[in-house]
């Protein structure tokens, strides 16, 4: 019975909503894979323009497979427009190779925005300087320039979910209330 209870707690925690923000993504298969990841993890995906591809691009749909119509995805003309529409209490974390603070030194919470830059350039330097206290790094060997964008998003998103899957909690997402009340 204890195993079932832990399993139920883990499932309930998977109803937590995080926001994945891709700023000017360039490579369709990366975005498609991240869309699929967002769906699987229950996260909302935000695409900040300009995009390096069309949403109906065949390789984007192929990477997202037949899931694309189910993905909670929103397009924004700029990061500023997204930030203006976001909940004012929301926390934003900016993933970059240009900081020493590892992602595991952060306590993630429901509703956090995990922000990632373009595959070739990352996030704008001005954005990183403005939000230096919220910049996070995924540590890697010095000989590696960077990780694949979809890999980075997966690492960050599932670390955030892992942190919130520990212990008993009531999800803030109303769609998940039925799951937690059936425990």
Predicted features and spans:
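Post-transcriptional modification and biogenesis factors for structured RNAs
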Residues: 1-183
């Amino acid at each position: 019975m204890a195993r079932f209870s832990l399993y139920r707690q883990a499932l309930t925690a998977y109803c937590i909503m995080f926001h994945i923000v891709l700023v000017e993504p360039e490579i369709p298969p990366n975005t498609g894979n991240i869309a699929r990841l967002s769906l699987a993890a229950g996260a909302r995906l935000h695409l900040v323009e300009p995009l390096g591809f069309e949403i109906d691009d065949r390789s984007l749909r192929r990477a997202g497979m037949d899931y694309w119509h189910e993905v909670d995805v929103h397009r924004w003309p700029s990061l500023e427009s997204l930030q203006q529409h976001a909940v004012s209490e929301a926390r934003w974390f900016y993933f970059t190779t240009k900081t020493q603070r590892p992602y595991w030194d952060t306590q993630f919470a429901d509703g956090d925005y995990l922000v990632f830059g373009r595959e070739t350039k990352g996030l704008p330097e001005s954005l990183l300087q403005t939000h230096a206290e919220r910049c996070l790094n995924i540590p890697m060997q010095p000989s590696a320039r960077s990780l694949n964008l979809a890999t980075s998003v997966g690492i960050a998103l599932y670390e955030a979910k892992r942190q919130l899957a520990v212990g008993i909690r009531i999800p803030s997402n109303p769609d998940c209330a039925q799951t937690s009340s059936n425990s």
